[in-house]
């Protein structure tokens, strides 16, 4: 069985990474929306394993440990700091179990994960030291549990992304580092998206790019510029929602679809985004365009589901286990072309 490293795989073609665990696990009934703490690894590990395997079946080459928001400060917020290490190790063990039982002829890569701490304060040494400690302990656990790569993601402060990369680079593992700017073309500390990515490459990021917050329409223009400038591999993992030039992220995305029962809070985020979901063809088109630009590390973040991950994989020319079950309207009773289908039913399609 082949067991290539991340960079070798990227040098030879696309690598698919399923993210977006928060939303999908919440939809499956195993996580509280808004709070978004991944207790599932302790409380319902089978549910987490099932999602990993569904993503694997759909074509994800990377099994990313679900430790997003599973850091010390978030665990303090919910009063469960004592469960910090057990939660992280449980998530890593589940991911490793899935990664080492691949469906194809090559091992999957298990990824340790660190992300935005929501504790960062610009020009605050105490904040920086605390964030460094948070990242370092999570990286140490990931290495100890056999991670093949490390992913740092969803950073909206450039300096926090630099710190995350520094901590990850203390290991010998390949690093993926992605930023998630809000509605502007710069991060919260005023550094442009392009300059942040250039700096991350210069500091040794093996794969640099963007994830989360923005849908395909408002992420792809930035990815085009990043790909033009960076020499390293580039990552693109948008959310699966129809963000616009007026509303570049999903945080203030309006529902203009005739909703008669809006969410009880001010925004559609995070519990009423469903009407703005991209369809599979939009996601496939994004993946194809990004891949044609030379972006080989691709996936979906919030809003990801196995069907959409399959679309990403197939859009870049891959055949995955789930390809067996892709759409087939040939035998649909009203839209199909099978000779056994009744004409008077098919003729009614425009009135259905």
Question: How should each PLM-predicted stretch be described?
Answer:
Residues 1-352:
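Domain-level signal for soluble alpha/beta catalytic cores
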């Amino acid at each position: 069985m082949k067991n290539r490293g991340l960079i070798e795989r990227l040098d030879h073609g696309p690598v698919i990474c399923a993210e977006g665990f928060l939303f999908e696990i919440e939809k499956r009934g195993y996580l509280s929306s808004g709070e978004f703490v991944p207790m599932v690894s302790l409380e319902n590990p089978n549910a987490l394993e099932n999602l990993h395997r569904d993503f694997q079946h759909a074509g994800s080459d990377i099994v990313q440990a679900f430790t997003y928001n599973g850091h010390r400060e978030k665990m303090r917020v919910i009063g469960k700091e004592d469960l910090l290490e057990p939660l992280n190790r449980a998530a890593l063990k589940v991911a490793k179990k899935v990664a080492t039982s691949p469906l194809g002829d090559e091992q999957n890569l298990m990824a340790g994960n660190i992300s935005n701490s929501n504790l960062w304060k610009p020009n605050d040494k105490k904040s920086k030291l605390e964030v460094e400690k948070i990242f370092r302990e999570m990286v140490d656990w990931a290495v100890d549990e056999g991670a093949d790569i490390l992913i740092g993601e969803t950073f909206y402060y450039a300096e926090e992304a630099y710190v995350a990369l520094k901590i990850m680079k203390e290991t010998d593992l390949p690093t993926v580092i992605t930023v998630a700017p809000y509605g502007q073309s710069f991060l919260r500390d005023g550094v442009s998206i392009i300059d942040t990515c250039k700096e991350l490459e210069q500091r040794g990021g093996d794969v640099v790019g963007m994830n989360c917050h923005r849908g395909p329409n408002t992420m792809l223009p930035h990815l085009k510029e990043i790909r033009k400038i960076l020499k390293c591999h580039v990552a693109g993992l948008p959310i699966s929602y129809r963000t616009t030039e007026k509303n570049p992220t999903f945080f203030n995305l309006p529902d203009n679809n005739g909703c008669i029962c809006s969410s009880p809070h001010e925004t559609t985020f995070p519990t009423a985004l469903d009407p703005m979901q991209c369809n599979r063809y939009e996601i496939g088109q994004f993946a194809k365009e990004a891949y044609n630009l030379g972006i080989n590390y691709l996936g979906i973040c919030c809003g990801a589901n196995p069907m959409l991950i399959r679309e990403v994989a197939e859009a870049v020319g891959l055949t995955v286990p789930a390809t067996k079950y892709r759409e087939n309207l040939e035998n649909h009773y009203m839209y199909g072309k099978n000779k056994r289908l009744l004409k008077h039913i098919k003729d009614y399609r425009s009135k259905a």
